C-alpha cells in the first residue's frame, strides 16, 4: 500500500516547477551552508518538518505552502537549532540545511489530490534544487547523510528517488524520522530499509505511539517497515527508553510497523502545542532517540569510511 501523501509527493516530483525557482546560490535560502565547513566531519543534508500555518493569498484564500517570508524563516529557526546542536552537532557534523517552501499545516486537511500535489510541488522542487546545489558546489564527491523529520521525512524519501545512481553510492544512510515507509516507496530506486545498526545506503524509518489505538493514519497508517533506534532491531525485542526522568519500554509492533512506547504519560508528552491526539508521540520522535540517532550516524559514517579504504 502507499500513503495519500507519498502518492502526491511522487506525482509532484514529476511536475517540478519551471518558473519561480529559488536561487540557492544565495545565502538567504540557507539556514546553514558551508559555514565552518570541515572535510573531516560528516555532511548531513537536513530537511525541516512542517512548522507553518497558511497565510492568505491576494484573494483571501489560504496558501498551502510557505512563501518564505521573514516571519516564516524566523519560525523555522527552532527546529534547525535543535537538530544542529543536539542530533547533528558541530563537533561531528557539517549541518547543511535549506529553507524551502514547505507545505503548511492546512494542506494536511486537504482530501483533493490535485490540491496536495500543488502544495507539495514547490517543496520538492526547492529541496531537489538545494540538494543539487550542495552536490555541485560543496560536496566534492564526499559521503553524506540525508535526514528529515515529518514533512522532512517525505523530502528525504523524495531525495533518494531524485538523486542519480552515482550520488546514491555516496549515501551513508537516510533518516526519515516520523514518517512512514510504505510498500510502494520501497519499490522505488535507492530505497532500501535498514535492517540493523550497520547497513549502509539504507533508510531508517520509525513512528512512536502509545498503542495501535492511537495512530495518525496520515503519516503512519501504511508503514511497511519499522526499526527501533534504541536497539536497532526490526523484530519486537523491547528496549528501555529513558527521557526527562521517565522510563518506558519500546518495541516494534510487527502488524502495524510502529514503535509502541509503554509507560509514559500521554498528558506530559503531548503535541507540543500542535493539535495531535494524545498517545501519538509524533513530536517526540526526534527527541526520544536523539542520542541514539547521533551515535548511529557517527557509527555508520565510520563504517562507510572503512568500506572505502578497503577498496
Stretch-by-stretch model annotation:
Residues 34-38, 84-89, 166, 195-197, ...:
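A general structural signal for short secondary-structure junctions and capping/turn motifs
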Residues 1-87:
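Flexible, membrane-associating and regulatory peripheral segments of lipid-active enzymes
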Residues 44, 95-97, 203-205:
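Conserved beta-strand scaffold positions in the cores of enzyme catalytic domains, especially
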Residues 126-140, 161-311:
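Surface cap/lid and interfacial helix-loop subdomains adjacent to catalytic sites
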Residues 148-152, 156:
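Gly/Ala-rich beta-loop-alpha elbow adjacent to hydrolase catalytic centers
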Residues 40-42, 91-95, 140-143, 169-173:
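Loop/turn elements at helix/coil->beta-strand transitions in domains of secreted/extracellular proteins
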Residues 48-142, 269-311:
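Active-site catalytic motif of lipid deacylating hydrolases and related acyltransferases
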Amino acid at each position: 500500500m502507499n500513503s495519500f501523501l507519498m502518492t502526491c509527493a511522487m506525482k509532484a516530483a514529476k511536475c517540478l516547477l519551471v518558473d519561480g525557482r529559488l536561487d540557492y546560490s544565495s545565502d538567504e535560502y540557507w539556514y546553514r551552508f558551508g559555514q565552518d565547513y570541515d572535510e573531516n566531519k560528516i555532511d548531513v543534508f537536513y530537511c525541516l518538518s512542517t512548522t507553518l500555518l497558511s497565510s492568505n493569498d491576494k484573494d483571501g484564500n489560504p496558501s498551502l505552502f510557505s512563501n518564505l517570508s521573514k516571519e516564516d524563516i524566523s519560525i523555522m529557526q527552532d527546529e534547525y537549532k535543535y537538530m544542529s546542536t543536539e542530533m547533528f552537532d558541530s563537533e561531528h557534523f557539517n549541518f547543511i540545511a535549506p529553507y524551502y517552501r514547505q507545505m503548511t499545516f492546512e494542506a494536511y486537511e486537504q482530501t483533493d489530490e490535485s490540491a496536495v500535489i500543488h502544495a507539495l510541488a514547490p517543496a520538492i522542487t526547492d529541496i531537489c534544487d538545494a540538494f543539487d546545489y550542495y552536490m555541485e558546489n560543496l560536496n566534492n564527491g564526499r559521503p553524506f547523510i540525508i535526514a528529515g523529520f515529518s514533512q522532512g521525512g517525505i523530502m528525504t524519501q523524495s531525495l533518494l528517488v531524485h538523486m542519480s545512481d552515482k550520488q546514491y553510492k555516496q549515501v551513508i544512510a537516510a533518516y526519515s524520522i516520523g514518517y512512514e515507509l510504505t510498500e510502494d516507496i520501497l519499490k522505488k530506486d535507492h530505497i532500501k530499509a535498514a535492517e540493523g545498526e550497520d547497513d549502509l545506503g539504507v533508510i531508517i524509518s520509525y513512528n512512536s505511539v502509545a498503542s495501535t489505538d492511537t495512530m495518525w493514519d496520515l503519516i503512519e497508517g501504511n508503514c511497511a517497515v519499522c526499526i527501533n533506534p534504541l536497539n536497532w532491531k526490526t523484530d519486537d525485542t523491547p528496549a528501555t527508553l529513558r527521557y526527562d526522568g521517565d522510563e518506558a519500554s519500546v518495541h516494534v509492533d510487527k502488524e502495524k510497523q510502529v514503535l509502541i512506547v509503554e509507560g509514559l504519560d500521554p498528558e506530559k508528552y503531548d503535541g507540543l502545542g500542535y493539535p495531535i491526539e494524545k498517545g501519538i508521540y509524533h513530536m517526540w520522535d526526534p527527541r526520544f532517540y536523539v542520542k541514539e540517532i547521533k551515535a548511529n550516524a557517527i557509527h555508520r559514517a565510520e563504517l562507510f569510511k572503512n568500506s572505502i579504504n578497503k577498496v
